[in-house]
Each structure stands twice: as C-alpha cells, then as structure tokens.
C-alpha cells in the first residue's frame, strides 16, 4: 500500500507540510481574530444604534462584504497596494511574498472580509432579538446600566448563534485558503496544493488535502464542545440523560 505522503517534486510531502502548514495556520488564525473582533464590534454598534444612519451604513457594508467574491476583493487590495507604492515609493502593503509583518495584512484582510461581514449581520440580528426579550426589559426596569445589560444579558445569550456564524465562516475561510494563498504568493499549504494540482502530482495532492480535511474535523469538534458549554438546553439534556 502506497503512503499518501510521497514526494512533491523530489521533496517529501511531510517536509513540505512541516514548512507550509504553520504559515497557513498563522494566516487563518490572524484572519479569524480580525473577523470575530470586527464583526462583533460592528454588530454591537449596529444593534445599539438601530434606526440610525450609522446602523444603516454598517448593515450596507456587511451586505456588500458578504456579496463580494473573495478573489475580487483580493484584486482590489492588490491594486491598492500597487497604487500606494506608485504614490509613496514604499511597500506599505506588500502584495506578494511571506512575512509575519505587512506581508500578512492583505491576505488576512481578504480571508477576514466575508466572515466579518457575516458575523456583523448575524450578531446584529441575534442582539436585536435578545434586546427585545422580556428579561432584558426587566433588567432595564431595575435600573441596570446599559453596559451591564449588554455584557451580562445580551451578549451572553447571543453566544450560540454568533458561534454558529464563526464556525461557518471558518469553514469558508478554509475553502478559499488555497486561492488566497496563490493570489498573494503566500507559501502555505493552499498554494502548495494548487501547485501540486498543476503539475499533476497525485501523491502530493492527497497529502495536502488530508491536513485540510483534518482541520475541518477539528473545527467541527471544537464547535460541538463549545455548543455544550454555551447552550443551557444542551447542558440540561446531557444532565437528564445522565
């Protein structure tokens, strides 16, 4: 039986994975942090300021982010980086290559754009539904500060739908990772996978796909464990079964 971890252009696939996988995980991690932080912040702002121009603008931006293809967003950011270089003579936003500094910014923004927009939209909807709940009105009538109500009653109960959006967004980021890495020449597992497909290296393709599939499994497993912690209904069901 042949091992799926053969050779990629004379280099063992395991060696290629050891080189490329940390770069892909780093890019995914930074993009996920950007997406969750920006999405939650913008979603909270849109919900707190509902019926205002700020809320309408944020919702329009989130709809635009969801509907914009990632490769088109990548092309726009590359154009911006080239334009800034032509104007300033400095590589403020490098459009290709590897580095844990400015090189990371553009691919991370492309990976984070659509997930951030999705988190913004769903967190806005979830927060609005909870803010109109009876227990939130009771908390207001007791004179609790808006910040306390938001943190203790609203955000805590919006955790499950927001987590669902984050998980779906992370799956989407994993799916488009090879394209983004290839566009920005980021030397991660996605770029190595597309290169192996181009040269028809079957062993390398299989060896590159397996870690990506394993990442999907790990994401789903972690999500299920978090659901058990965040959803009281699942905790009660587990306690009843015991």
What function would you assign to each model-found segment?
Residues 4-8, 85-96, 239:
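Short helix-coil transition/hinge motifs at the ends and kinks of transmembrane helices
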Residues 56-58:
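Cytosolic-side membrane-entry/anchor segment at the start of a transmembrane helix
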Residues 1-15:
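Short membrane-interfacial helix/loop motifs at transmembrane-helix boundaries
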Residues 60-91, 110-116, 121:
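Membrane-water interface segments at the C-terminal ends of transmembrane alpha-helices
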Residues 17, 21-54, 70, 96-242:
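Alpha-helical transmembrane segments of integral membrane proteins
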């Amino acid at each position: 039986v042949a091992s799926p971890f053969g050779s990629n252009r004379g280099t063992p696939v395991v060696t290629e994975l050891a080189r490329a996988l940390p770069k892909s995980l780093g890019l995914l991690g930074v993009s996920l942090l950007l997406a969750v932080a920006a999405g939650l912040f913008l979603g909270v702002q849109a919900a707190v300021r509902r019926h205002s121009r700020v809320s309408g603008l944020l919702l329009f931006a989130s709809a635009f982010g969801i509907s914009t293809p990632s490769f088109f967003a990548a092309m726009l950011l590359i154009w911006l980086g080239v334009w800034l270089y032509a104007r300033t003579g400095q590589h403020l936003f490098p459009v290709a290559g590897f580095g844990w500094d400015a090189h990371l910014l553009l691919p991370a923004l492309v990976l984070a754009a659509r997930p951030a927009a999705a988190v913004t939209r769903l967190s806005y909807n979830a927060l609005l539904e909870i803010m109109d709940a009876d227990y939130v009105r009771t908390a207001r009538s007791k004179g609790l500060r808006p910040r306390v109500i938001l943190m203790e009653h609203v955000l805590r109960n919006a955790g499950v739908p927001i987590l669902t959006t984050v998980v779906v967004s992370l799956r989407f980021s994993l799916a488009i990772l090879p394209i983004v890495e290839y566009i920005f020449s980021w030397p991660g597992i996605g770029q190595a996978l597309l290169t192996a497909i181009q040269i028809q290296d079957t062993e390398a393709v299989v060896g590159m796909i397996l870690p990506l599939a394993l990442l999907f499994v790990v994401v789903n497993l972690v999500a299920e464990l978090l659901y058990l912690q965040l959803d009281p209904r699942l905790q009660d069901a587990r306690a009843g079964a015991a």
